Curated annotation (Swiss-Prot):
Protein's name in the database: Protein RecA
Primary location: cytoplasm
Spans annotated as Disordered: 328-352
Top-level taxon: Bacteria
């Protein structure tokens, strides 16, 4: 055994000499085995992902039908990374990013790096350069379907370009995956849906760009609208289901239900109420919601309004929920409140 041990030590020294220190190591010697994450900005999705958010140094694919909320989910992740002091980049291949909407979701558009490339090759080369810099914490590509190969752009309308996009994605991901892992960048690829022709049995839906992204992605999210949120005759948003169809860092197939409110994004208060009432942090009696014997409101929408007007209570509930699911409590936004200890009245909260 001593001869084998000596041979192994000699081989390890040779590998480190040739490829550099850290090129091979025992798994127990790795300083941080725990997966580092960044909150998705949606409490329900953090819980469904199993590790408290999107894993750093991994590839994430978000796909679903049109107007289902894919870009909204990605923008919330960007806003959360920026809130923690990170740098974000958005590669807008669809040329459709609305900066006003992004700002409403909490994105700091003054600091967001934006690229609107002409070709798929250009988009992926920009992504690679940003990842290899090691200075970008999250990068979003919107969308894979809009990454048009240069040959297709320069060709005639109607020319056949079979498999060009799939080859482009396959080559890019081969180059990107290692760099993404080393730089601990979260790489989010938004994708569309297509129908397979002639499928009689099984799911006819597929995503463009070939199979490479399906293999390289550590997390795949399927975003679907469930139903509209109405107050009277007015439609204010939609209940949306986000299914974790692939997860390499936690058990898959969990579903997060969130409220996407038009012009506001994912409702933080809605997730707090739903999950809080499921685990009895928030008590529900009939139509009334209450927390620590204080009534929040009658009906879900009224209770959401109350939590929006009282962010300190919302933060208390969210902290208890995160403790229950062993999630990172630092992801709870602090209520921006000024309180004078000499005053006996309730603290006032600036909602502007």
């Amino acid at each position: 055994m001593s001869d084998r041990r000596a041979a192994l030590e000699s081989a390890l020294r040779q590998i480190e000499k040739q490829f550099g220190k850290g090129s091979i190591m025992k798994l127990g010697e790795v300083s941080n085995i725990q997966i580092s994450t960044a909150s998705s900005g949606a409490l329900a999705l953090d819980i469904a992902l199993g590790v408290g958010g999107f894993p750093r140094g991994r590839i994430v694919e978000i796909y679903g039908p049109e107007s289902s909320g894919k870009t909204t989910v990605a923008l919330h992740a960007i806003a959360e990374v920026q809130r923690q002091g990170g740098q974000a980049a958005f590669i807008d291949a669809e040329h459709a990013l609305d900066p006003v909407y992004a700002a409403k979701l909490g994105v700091n558009i003054d600091e967001l790096l934006l690229s609107q490339p002409d070709t798929g090759e250009q988009a992926l080369e920009i992504a690679e350069a940003l990842v290899r810099s090691g200075a970008v914490d999250i990068i979003v590509v919107d969308s894979v379907a809009a990454l048009v190969p240069k040959a297709e752009i320069e060709g005639e309308m109607g020319d056949s370009h079979v498999g060009l996009q799939a080859r482009l994605m396959s080559q890019a991901l081969r180059k990107l995956s290692g760099a993404i892992n080393k730089s601990k960048t979260i790489a989010i690829f938004i994708n569309q849906l297509r129908e397979k022709v002639g499928v009689m049995f099984g799911n006819p839906e597929t995503t463009p760009g070939g199979r490479a992204l399906k293999f390289y992605a550590s997390v795949r999210l399927d975003v679907r609208k469930a139903e509209s949120i109405k107050v009277g005759n007015d439609i204010l948003g939609s209940k949306t289901k986000i299914k974790v169809v692939k997860n390499k860092v936690a058990p898959p197939f969990k579903v997060a239900e969130v409220d996407i409110m038009y012009g506001e994004g994912i409702s933080r208060e809605g997730s707090i109420l739903d999950i809080g009432s499921e685990i009895d942090v928030v008590q529900k009696s009939g139509a009334w919601y209450s927390f620590n014997e204080e009534r929040l409101g009658q009906g879900r929408e009224n209770s959401k309004v109350f939590l929006k007007e009282n962010p300190h209570i919302a933060s208390q509930i969210e902290t208890k929920v995160r403790e229950y699911f062993s999630l990172n409590p630092s992801s709870v936004p602090e209520a921006e409140a000024e309180h004078d200890p000499e005053q006996d009245e309730e603290p006032t909260f600036d909602l502007e």
